[in-house]
Amino acid sequence: NEIAITKNVSEGLNLFAASLPWEAGDNVLVCPELEHPNNIYLWFNLARSKGIEVRTIPADEGRMPVAAMGNALDERTRVVTMPSISFAPGFLTDVKSLALAAKQVGALTLVDAAQSIGAIDTNVRDLGIDALAVATQKCLLSLYGFGFLYVRREVAESLVPIHVARYGIDLGEAHETAFAEDELKYQPGALRFDLGNYNYLGATAAATALDLLAGWGMKNVEAHVCGLASKLATGLLELGLPVAGGSPGSHLAHIVSVGESGGGRHYSADDPAMNSLYDHFVAAGIKLSIRSGVLRLSIGVYNQSADIEHVIAAARTWIETKGH
């Protein structure tokens, strides 16, 4: 009962944020440079409707600014939000440290885990977070239109859902059409956020994918994808390409980005060389994206060493033919 069914990450983030008892002057901490836009819009919408303050903290050379966020906390901070892995350049966030800092002032932590669940072994209790949203179309190997919202039971019990439907109401033994005007009892925990009807096709795909991931073991999955990412980052660096974050380290998960973060459009970079490399990769049959000015190569559990070698070989060919 700590998990609600959603359509996507955006719905999960909004359901949680809009259900908090905001007062004018409360604040939320966010690092816009590292967030997907959908974990930015909702806070400015609440600033407009509830009078809250959105405290934007600059990134620390592409990394989550843990120390700066800690310094920005005060007694009016209600939420610290963060990606488990940034939208771009795809670095790991020290979620546990931020959650611990937030607790010191009584603030809640909300995590956008779109880029990590299904690739990185995750234990929400070990992290000490209060809420986490994820969708199934990325590392959970499933479909668009299905997702999960985790809310720690003690937190969920204090929230009044902004949207209510019969799936989120505790009817006990009564028929689903039963309604008593003086009684509105929410389902326990995060179940109060369920709206229904569910995306049953998405649920079927997610159930199968979760069984597969559990069978492989998430520690094994993480070791596999992160090992391949390390090999890719090292190989591209040896070719002289500007790999975000430099040599593999604690920042690296399963995403390797090439180029300089910032600027660019959703499907193009400011640097013509990066656009050229992107086109070369696509022509070589390599699937990747451009986000915030960098080429983002995301490694899945299905990838193998041969895939990494293919990317490195394609990059080498591009350098030789384009003279970069």
Predicted regions and their residues:
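Pyridoxal 5′-phosphate
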Residues: 1-324
